[in-house]
Curated annotation (Swiss-Prot):
Domain of life: Bacteria
Source species: Pseudomonas aeruginosa (strain UCBPP-PA14)
Keyword flag GTP-binding: no
Keywords: Antiviral defense
Name of the protein in its database record: CRISPR-associated protein Csy3
Stored InterPro entries: CRISPR-assoc_prot_Csy3
Length: 342
């Protein structure tokens, strides 16, 4: 009897296994970091400004008289801003991170044969490679405070404190000088080993892992800080509308959990990096929205779907580096079922 041909499930979904909370912002003095529980929250406030015409002009608007008239017409804007108080030089950003087991186990799959083969493939990876390399890179991105994004740029000093929380108590603690840990590579660092082992144990399901992550960035009294910006889908009448809305939780400026997660999974150095870009976030097509470019095009056969199908359906295991990339996508989570042809 011939063996049935395996095909991708039309319904295939995975839950994320790195589950961060929103990150809340507070402010205080660098010398008082040990008493930061008492620091006040950074608040978001509105500011109205008069801007100047600086956008690229259409050909019909380049007449000097029209330009002068445009300049005389005020460009009024209302925006949200967030700043440290005038007597506080340090930003504190705090979030928690759950590391969940069951990586590679789909939360939804409507094809039992495909599910069995997928689990077999993931089990082979875990037995051969384990989660050590991925966990080391996730630990690296926690320790270097990549999750601060723009708030990290230009900071005089950045310290990251990570606590392993067990039954509400601190079971183990780490401190890192974030600026001493690079953003462009993942060189082996002995001080990260214990944290990486803990993350790997969480991914393998051998223990409950909840981390409290606190970063302190010394940026200067009264300096502007950068919470997440909200996407306003229904802007209605654009005239008079606020042009920038910042995210806050209970009046505290905050960074979206999705943005924290994006920073933590910025570990993909296995794509064709012809531009010297460095690590990018793990995405099925290597998408970098800030550049409008996908670095893992299907024609290169290095995108997630091609690698996964070859590995699961055809028993063509990719190179070890690309295996890490595929499993990292499963840890990321998402809906990966077979697309319907129209």
């Amino acid at each position: 009897m011939s063996k049935p041909i395996l095909s991708t499930a039309s319904v295939l979904a995975f839950e994320r296994k790195l589950d961060p909370s929103d990150a809340l912002m507070s402010a205080g003095a660098w010398a008082q970091r040990d008493a930061s529980q008492e620091w006040p929250a950074v608040t978001v406030r509105e500011k109205s400004v008069r801007g100047t015409i600086s956008n690229r002009l259409k050909t019909k608007d380049r007449d000097p008289a029209k330009l002068d008239a445009s300049i005389q017409s005020p460009n009024l804007q209302t925006v949200d801003v967030a700043n440290l108080p005038s007597d506080a030089d340090t930003l504190k950003v705090r979030f928690t991170l759950r590391v969940l087991g069951g990586a590679g186990t789909p939360s939804a799959c409507n094809d039992a044969a495909y599910r069995d083969k997928l689990l077999q493939t993931v089990a082979t990876y875990v037995n051969d490679q384990g989660f050590a390399e991925l966990a080391r890179r996730y630990a690296h991105n926690l320790a270097n405070a990549r999750f601060l994004w723009r708030n990290r740029v230009g900071a005089e000093a950045v310290e990251v404190r990570i606590n392993h929380i067990r039954q509400g108590e601190v079971a183990r603690a780490w401190r890192f000088d974030a600026l001493a840990i690079g953003l462009r590579d993942f060189k082996a660092d002995a001080e990260l080993d214990a944290l990486a082992e803990l993350i790997a144990s969480g991914l393998s399901g051998s223990g409950h892992v909840l981390l409290e992550v606190v970063a302190f960035a010394r940026i200067g009294d009264g300096q502007e800080v950068f919470p997440s910006q909200e996407l306003i889908l229904d802007k209605g009448d654009k005239k008079g509308q606020k042009s920038k809305t910042l995210y806050s939780v209970r009046d505290a400026a905050a960074i979206h959990s999705q943005k924290i997660g994006n920073a933590l999974r910025t570990i993909d150095t296995w794509y064709p990096d012809e531009d010297g870009l460095g690590p990018i976030a793990v995405e099925p097509y290597g998408s970098v929205t800030s550049q409008g470019k996908a670095y893992r095009q299907p024609k290169q056969k290095l995108d997630f779907y091609t690698l996964l199908d070859n590995w699961v359906l055809r028993d063509e295991a990719p190179a070890v580096e690309q295996q890490h990339y595929v499993i990292a996508n499963l840890i990321r989570g998402g809906v990966f079922g077979e697309a319907e042809e129209k």
